[in-house]
């Protein structure tokens, strides 16, 4: 079956229908929620650090603390605006630092804690108690603890949020099937940080963020906007650079936008994502133009800013035992598909097109502005005749 016979889903009709809606939905975040301001950012960073230095730390609350830290970087005012713009009715709790007295082995001790409704003073005190035990052990081993190994290192909060950036890429599955991939990726990109902190346990921290995002979906909205703001801010630490790379990979792929609909145009995004998987090659341009119309916030950052990379992905899989046409953003990435194709006509058409590409090498490479290295890589992938490559 020819590609021209495989029609794009009725995305545009649905878009028109949604655009005519005169009403908005209001959601509730429940009871009072904690929205910290900039002034407690340092304390929240230290809380993250205490968890990181604690050997065999209990990360039950790490996801929550990480999100509170993210909100403190955005600031109270912007966090409230994000939630209200997303349709949430918010009753916000102000967060301050207070002194808390707690009995420790029969002795009363003082701790500086935050006035949080989501995390009791006792839990915060216990986090510090456990971290002190690990810190004493570090002092014995090292003699003096270097700044980058301490609980108050300024990048502790961002280290925790790097794991959140990995989790957010997997929420599209609707379950925790992506946990193994998150752990593997974290072990790779955060390997230096794991040498610094014995409490940096990717599996436990990832599960904590899964729990937070599943239980409090409004945190997804906050995290996406935080990620955009953080990634667009120049400068910063090495870990901030790692975070930006991880987050923009997730945002660019559009998976979170398309599946969860965390922004204003959410439903349109979901439809476009599912419809574009059924798109034929001749309609890729049509989908691309639709992406331009919606703008980067719709989850099309990757193809709008790097169409070359997306087009190159068409040629990356020379063996088409099975083919899926279209990626979430609608540019038609072709990759191997395991299992029975849901659309046999689409499968046959995509497979035929891919084999034709591989056999003939009829791609206008000149429009891709390839470097010498990229061109060589593509030639090796497709093994085209030299005169078939248009430079």
From Swiss-Prot:
The segment annotated Involved in RNA synthesis and encapsidation runs over 1-364
Its PTM note reads:
Tyrosine phosphorylation modulates viral transcription and replication.
Keywords for this protein: Capsid protein, Helical capsid protein, Host cytoplasm, Host-virus interaction, Inhibition of host innate immune response by virus, Inhibition of host interferon signaling pathway by virus, Inhibition of host MAVS by virus, Inhibition of host MDA5 by virus, Inhibition of host NF-kappa-B by virus, Inhibition of host PKR by virus, Inhibition of host RLR pathway by virus, Interferon antiviral system evasion, Phosphoprotein, Ribonucleoprotein, RNA-binding, Viral immunoevasion, Viral nucleoprotein, Virion
Phosphoprotein among the record's keywords?
yes
Molecular-function GO term, any one: protein serine/threonine kinase inhibitor activity
Localization annotation? Virion; Host cytoplasm
Residue(s) carrying Phosphotyrosine: 38
This protein's major location comes to virion
Q: Which InterPro entries match?
A: Pneumo_ncap
Which terms does the UniProt entry file under GO BP?
A: symbiont-mediated suppression of host cytoplasmic pattern recognition receptor signaling pathway via inhibition of MAVS activity; symbiont-mediated suppression of host cytoplasmic pattern recognition receptor signaling pathway via inhibition of MDA-5 activity; symbiont-mediated suppression of host NF-kappaB cascade; symbiont-mediated suppression of host PKR/eIFalpha signaling; symbiont-mediated suppression of host type I interferon-mediated signaling pathway
Q: A single Pfam family, by name?
A: Pneumo_ncap
Residue numbers spanned by region Interaction with the phosphoprotein: 244-290, 338-364
One Gene Ontology term, aspect cellular component: helical viral capsid
Subunit relationships: Homomultimerizes to form the nucleocapsid. Binds to viral genomic RNA. Interacts with the phosphoprotein P. When in a monomeric RNA-free form, interacts with the phosphoprotein (via N-terminus). Interacts with protein M2-1; this interaction allows the association of nucleocapsid with the matrix protein. Interacts with host EIF2AK2/PKR; this interaction inhibits EIF2AK2 phosphorylation of EIF2S1 and blocks EIF2AK2-mediated translation shutoff.
UniProt record similarity statement: Belongs to the paramyxoviruses nucleocapsid family.
Its biological purpose is as follows:
Encapsidates the viral RNA genome by forming a left-handed helical nucleocapsid that protects the RNA from nucleases. RNA replication depends on the availability of soluble nucleoprotein. The encapsidated genomic RNA is termed the NC and serves as template for transcription and replication. Together with the phosphoprotein, sequesters host NF-kappa-B in inclusion bodies (IBs) thereby inhibiting this host defense pathway. May also act as a modulator of the innate immune response by sequestration of host IFIH1/MDA5 and MAVS into IBs.
Protein name listed in UniProt: Nucleoprotein
Q: Which organism is it from?
A: Bovine respiratory syncytial virus (strain Rb94)
Lineage of the source organism? Viruses, Riboviria, Orthornavirae, Negarnaviricota, Haploviricotina
């Amino acid at each position: 079956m020819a590609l021209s016979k495989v029609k794009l889903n009725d995305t545009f009709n649905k878009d028109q229908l949604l655009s005519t809606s005169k009403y908005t939905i209001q959601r509730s975040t429940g009871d009072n929620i904690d929205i910290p301001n900039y002034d407690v950012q340092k304390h929240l960073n230290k809380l993250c650090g205490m968890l990181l230095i604690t050997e065999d730390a209990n990360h039950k609350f790490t996801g929550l603390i990480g999100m509170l830290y993210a909100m403190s970087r955005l600031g109270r005012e912007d966090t409230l605006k994000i939630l209200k713009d997303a349709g949430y009715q918010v009753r916000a709790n102000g967060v301050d630092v207070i002194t808390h007295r707690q009995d420790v082995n029969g002795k009363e001790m003082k701790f500086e804690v935050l006035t949080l409704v989501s995390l009791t003073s006792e839990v915060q005190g216990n986090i510090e108690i456990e971290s002190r035990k690990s810190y004493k052990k570090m002092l014995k081993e090292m003699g003096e603890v270097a700044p980058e190994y301490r609980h108050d290192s300024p990048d502790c909060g961002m280290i925790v949020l790097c794991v959140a950036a990995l989790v957010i890429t997997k929420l599209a599955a609707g379950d925790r099937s992506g946990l193994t991939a998150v752990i593997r990726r974290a072990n790779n990109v955060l390997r230096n940080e794991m040498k610094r902190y014995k409490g940096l346990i990717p599996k436990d921290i990832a599960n904590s963020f899964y729990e937070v995002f599943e239980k409090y979906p409004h945190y997804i909205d906050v995290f996406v906007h935080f990620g955009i703001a953080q990634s667009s801010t120049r400068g910063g630490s090495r870990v901030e650079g790692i975070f930006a790379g991880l987050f923009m990979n997730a945002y660019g792929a559009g998976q979170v936008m398309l599946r969860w609909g965390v922004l204003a145009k959410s439903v349109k995004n979901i439809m476009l994502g599912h419809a574009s998987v059924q798109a034929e090659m001749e309609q890729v341009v049509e989908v691309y133009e639709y992406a331009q119309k919606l703008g980067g916030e719709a989850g099309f950052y990757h193809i709008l800013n790097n169409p070359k990379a997306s087009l190159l992905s068409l040629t990356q899989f020379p063996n088409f035992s099975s083919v899926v046409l279209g990626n979430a953003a609608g540019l038609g990435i072709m990759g191997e598909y395991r299992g029975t194709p849901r659309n046999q006509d689409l499968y046959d058409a995509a497979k035929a097109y891919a084999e034709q590409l591989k056999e003939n090498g009829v791609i206008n490479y000149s429009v891709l502005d390839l470097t010498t290295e990229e061109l060589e890589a593509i030639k090796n992938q497709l093994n085209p005749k030299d005169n078939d490559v248009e430079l």
